[in-house]
């Protein structure tokens, strides 16, 4: 048998390389931000504290005016007492009491605003914790960061009215381990302690969004709807703030109201809601009623969005990407509520006509 020699041939595909490209005097064009991303950026920009010389001068002027008013009232009381002008003395005492009550209210408003700013600082610290977890820094598993995260969580629990012997806090502490990082400690706190507060806020948002949608859908007066929805949105913000342990005064409420004004500038929400609503509306509903239903859905979605934004702002720990509440479950409940009430009412009306 003759020896056969096989030659090993390697088929190498020729690789075609593109020649290098050189760009001279070219302008780079950035991608346009989406509507939701642009709205979030505007929200964050509107909520950032702005320090300026004018504000400092205004505060200093208000302080001098308050001190001068108190001094003038005391001088008025003393002069009236020396001259035995008892009527003027009574007016001076009443004026001083009113001024002191006003100063007390201003101090309380300032303390509430300080608490709200403290809540914002906690959110920034938690965002830094999530950011360190995302980039996988070398200091992520340091003992110092873990202790800071634990202290932060305990301070948040105290602000929510939860003591160290609270069942949820005890359950969270039992889950802790010395090997856990700062991110894991904060995540466990969010899951065991803050989850109940989140559930209350989500339930409240779904309820008030559905109620607003139904009321707008069946109400014939647009002016009444406008003021009613504005009042309900403010009430929704107040209730969400109460759930997360924030006492809103005048200035903190103004600060949260900025978020409402930014979110009111939504683009095309009513038109999108109308397209969604027309999918399930039956053909026997009149065009006018269909428009009212679509408007109700749009208002309900707007209320839900405002509630979610207020929830993100009032929550002491910033949401992780997988924890952020979505409008999908609220949208389903919204559609079913409006459909059942409005279309049910329409069927009853037709039966009465028959």
From Swiss-Prot:
Coiled-coil regions listed in the entry: none
Keyword Membrane: yes
Membrane topology: Multi-pass membrane protein
Membrane-crossing segments per the record: 57-77, 87-107, 211-231
UniProt KW Transmembrane helix keyword: yes
Record keywords: Cell inner membrane, Cell membrane, Membrane, Transmembrane, Transmembrane helix
Subcellular location: Cell inner membrane
InterPro entries named in the record: DUF697, UPF0283
Domain of life: Bacteria
Location, primary (coarse class): membrane
GO cellular component: plasma membrane
PANTHER family per UniProt: UPF0283 MEMBRANE PROTEIN YCJF (PTHR39342:SF1)
Membership in a protein family: Belongs to the UPF0283 family.
Name of the protein described by the UniProt record: UPF0283 membrane protein HI_0043
């Amino acid at each position: 048998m003759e020896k056969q020699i096989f030659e090993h041939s390697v088929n190498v595909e020729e690789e075609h390389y593109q020649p290098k490209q050189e760009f001279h005097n070219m302008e780079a064009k950035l991608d346009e931000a989406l509507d939701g991303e642009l709205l979030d950026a505007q929200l964050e920009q509107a909520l950032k504290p702005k320090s300026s010389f004018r504000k400092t001068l205004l505060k200093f002027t208000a302080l001098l005016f308050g001190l001068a008013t108190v001094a003038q009232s005391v001088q008025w009381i003393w002069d009236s007492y020396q001259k035995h002008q008892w009527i003027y003395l009574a007016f001076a005492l009443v004026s001083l009491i009113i001024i002191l009550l006003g100063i007390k209210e201003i101090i309380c408003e300032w303390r509430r605003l300080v608490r709200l700013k403290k809540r914002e600082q906690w959110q920034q610290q938690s965002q830094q914790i999530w950011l360190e977890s995302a980039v996988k820094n070398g200091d992520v598993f340091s003992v110092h960061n873990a202790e800071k995260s634990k202290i932060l969580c305990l301070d948040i629990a105290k602000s929510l009215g939860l003591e160290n012997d609270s069942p949820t806090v005890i359950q969270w502490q039992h889950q802790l381990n010395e090997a856990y990082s700062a991110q894991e400690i904060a995540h466990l706190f969010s899951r065991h302690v803050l989850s109940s507060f989140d559930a209350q806020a989500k339930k409240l948002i779904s309820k008030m969004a559905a109620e607003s949608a139904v009321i707008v859908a069946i109400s014939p007066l647009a002016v009444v709807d406008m003021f009613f929805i504005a009042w309900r949105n403010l009430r929704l913000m107040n209730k969400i703030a109460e759930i997360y342990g924030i006492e809103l005064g005048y200035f903190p409420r103004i600060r949260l109201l900025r978020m409402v004004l930014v979110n009111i500038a939504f683009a095309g929400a009513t038109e999108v809601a109308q397209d969604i609503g027309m999918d399930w509306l039956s053909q026997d509903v009149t065009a006018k009623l269909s428009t009212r239903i679509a408007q109700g859905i749009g208002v309900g979605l707007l209320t839900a969005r405002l509630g979610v934004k207020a929830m993100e702002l009032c929550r002491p720990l910033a949401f992780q990407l997988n924890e952020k509440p979505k409008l999908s479950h609220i949208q389903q409940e919204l559609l079913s509520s409006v459909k059942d009430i409005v279309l049910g009412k329409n069927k009853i009306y037709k039966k009465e006509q028959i």
